[in-house]
């Protein structure tokens, strides 16, 4: 059972965190009484602040200044957030409308981080779907001329690759249809690795009259699957980090390096597999030293209950946690809806 004193001290901590997030200035007992309805005396507030400092939730950086939250203080604050303020109907419609304007998967994801960085005023990042999760959805075969075919390979993550195939002998329309059906029969719903194996087998077993054309198509498709780019990130809003307070800006180069080199963020986002959970890593909770002065908020995006990748924001430890968590969660859900065609 939490005592009344403990509840009051949490309210004092909550007020300190809220004021510091708003101003990035140390918070004193006088300003707390002026801004918040704590219904206690100044002496009680000072005593509570002393206890909170002893417990490691706040710190007094200078003898004559007020207190600022520590990472432990932010963690207690975040863990105590139970009611995330939902976005307004107008905000939800604006998000969905902007994302639905994307012409393909990559454009939708690019729009998602642009939107997220604008909504949160932080740097936003999204991981493109990994090859491990991608499956071949369809392969279209379009005759450009009797001696040339266009292959259009589509994965369930929305990636589209187009390749031309030069033929040794012309194909009739009926033969193109047979070739298309055989390719889709071999490729359908397979992972990219399994698809490559299936293509190599198909090239050897195709009917004699289209075997040469099939071999050429399979060679092109195998090379296309092998040449798929490795995991990538899309970034937006890194300029937002330049407005950090003086105390935080000293670590800015390390944070920017982590974002630009991508390896650190890819490792972090690759571990995001839950579509419903928003994770908050505060300062030293981040495994990589480059991010130990920042807060990283992430969640998964995807459709049909399966995560395709992670997205989130990177910013200072004094960010608006409740608002940022709400917006990260909302954008991820709407990305999933757009990808699912809802």
From Swiss-Prot:
Pfam families noted in UniProt: HrcA
SUPFAM superfamilies for the chain: GAF domain-like, Winged helix' DNA-binding domain
One GO-annotated biological process of the protein: negative regulation of DNA-templated transcription
Keywords assigned: Repressor, Stress response, Transcription, Transcription regulation
Domain of life: Bacteria
Function text: Negative regulator of class I heat shock genes (grpE-dnaK-dnaJ and groELS operons). Prevents heat-shock induction of these operons.
Protein name (Swiss-Prot/TrEMBL): Heat-inducible transcription repressor HrcA
Source organism per UniProt: Corynebacterium glutamicum (strain R)
